Amino acid sequence: MDPHKKVALETEFFTEYGEASRYQIQEVIGKGSYGVVASAIDTHSGEKVAIKKINDVFEHVSDATRILREIKLLRLLRHPDIVEIKHVMLPPSRREFRDIYVVFELMESDLHQVIKANDDLTPEHYQFFLYQLLRGLKFIHTANVFHRDLKPKNILANSDCKLKICDFGLARVSFNDAPSAIFWTDYVATRWYRAPELCGSFFSKYTPAIDIWSIGCIFAEMLTGKPLFPGKNVVHQLDIMTDLLGTPPPEAIARIRNEKARRYLGNMRRKPPVPFTHKFPHVDPLALRLLHRLLAFDPKDRPSAEEALADPYFYGLANVDREPSTQPIPKLEFEFERRKITKEDVRELIYREILEYHPQMLQEYLRGGEQTSFMYPSGVDRFKRQFAHLEENYGKGEKGSPLQRQHASLPRERVPAPKKENGSHNHDIENRSIASLVTTLESPPTSQHEGSDYRNGTSQTGYSARSLLKSASISASKCIGMKPRNKSEYGESNNDTVDALSQKVAALHT
């Protein structure tokens, strides 16, 4: 990048935020109605990060509440398979700030782009992708959180096959003792990934099984390269679901809350289920058996994330020590969901959440400090024009133009208010293409430095999502050998996954 443009970039993005000198802006990687996302270098750690500037946060209380919800959930749900907020910049004024700068770990693409750009993903990819999603979902559900909008675009991806769940703006926390909750909402899940019990219903009593259905749809999309249930409307959605799964039994239809949808299914001609071996030819029978469980029409027949992880499909990969649970989120954290809040209320709540990333000021706040304005003296001069420069130059085809993915999670585009097939149960895992698996696990990278640039924090100019996960450029050993997290709170690094799986494969040949 031209040095003069670099200086302009670094003096226009952050406006008044004095902490901005910590980050060296690299390029724009996303832009939408919410604001701008830029990649940057954290000069304290040398890491590449994504910084999302959210404009006019408090223009609509509903949008501000969604942002508050996601910032809070991502702080409380820290897990290797969930995108991480690394920092939130302290605003220049407690009472008057309008924009928020959230610093995320930088991810290269999302699962939607990976599926679209790769027609040669292997069974090992499918297995490891699904394993990560279920492992993250187990953690989310043990916190009594329902994600409610799982889809490929809401799953970030790196070229080492690491996936991370993101976009928690529509998530909800259940505080009922019963394993279900009732929510009034204007939007739940993109239709294609929406569980049948939610079709046409905005007032829904449901369970974590809604997320399990979404995971099943995502898994099927991995296997075929295209969405499984691309419904054009609610009726069409029900039609294509039943075309594959067959007409549901009366007790399953009774669980549909929308009266019209319930009546439509009750009057539908009887359809036999399509064998999954016909719909998904050449797919591992164990994978199809698990998929059939995930896509059970009746939510009570779907497994929990923990039960799915125990499926024989993950034999040799799943390990309870690497699949941590967590405690339910305390009710006090989401007390604001139970009352009507004003713009001033949500501003104070977001400010309080930002202070979680500024421990010294948090202590002062908790002691009752009343400081309401703390302008940074050099902030305006250094960053005043940066945002305008980013908007002006975004999407002009210059070097380093962004990928389609908005690489950080928070927040989504603003959403307007709406106007068992029997698998091969005794199939032995030891017979599952062992020679192919060993070859893949032992295959060396195509070059000595393959895949190292991103992990070392250096730039990858010209990187394309189309190259992501190509078999010619990445081996399953690298896929399964995820980058270890420093000081892992879960007791062992992800390299142990490789060791365990490699030992298992070796044992199969003895």
Swiss-Prot record:
Please give the SMART domains that the UniProt record associates with this protein. Answer: S_TKc (SM00220)
Q: How is the polypeptide modified once translated?
A: Dually phosphorylated on Thr-185 and Tyr-187, which activates the enzyme.
GO CC entries: cytosol; mitochondrion; nucleus
Which stretches does UniProt call biased (Polar residues)?
Answer: 433-461
Q: Detail which positions bind ATP.
A: I29, G30, K31, G32, S33, Y34, G35, V36, V37, K52
| Domain Protein kinase, residue spans | 23-314
Biased composition (Basic and acidic residues) is annotated at: 410-431
Q: Which Pfam families match?
A: Pkinase (PF00069)
Q: What's any GO biological process attached to this entry?
A: abscisic acid-activated signaling pathway
Q: What class of enzyme is it?
A: transferase
The record's region (Disordered) falls at 393-461
According to the UniProt entry, how is activity regulated?
A: Activated by threonine and tyrosine phosphorylation.
Q: Where is this motif: TXY?
A: 185-187
Keyword Kinase annotated:
yes
Which residue positions does Phosphothreonine occur at? Answer: T185, T190
The record's catalysed reaction(s) read:
L-seryl-[protein] + ATP = O-phospho-L-seryl-[protein] + ADP + H(+); L-threonyl-[protein] + ATP = O-phospho-L-threonyl-[protein] + ADP + H(+)
Q: What is its EC number?
A: 2.7.11.24
Q: Which GO terms describe its molecular function?
A: ATP binding; MAP kinase activity; protein serine kinase activity
Q: Which residues carry this modification: Phosphotyrosine?
A: Y187
Family recorded in the similarity comment: Belongs to the protein kinase superfamily. CMGC Ser/Thr protein kinase family. MAP kinase subfamily.
What does the entry note on its domains?
The TXY motif contains the threonine and tyrosine residues whose phosphorylation activates the MAP kinases.
> Can you say what this protein is called?
Mitogen-activated protein kinase 9
* Protein encoded by which gene: MPK9
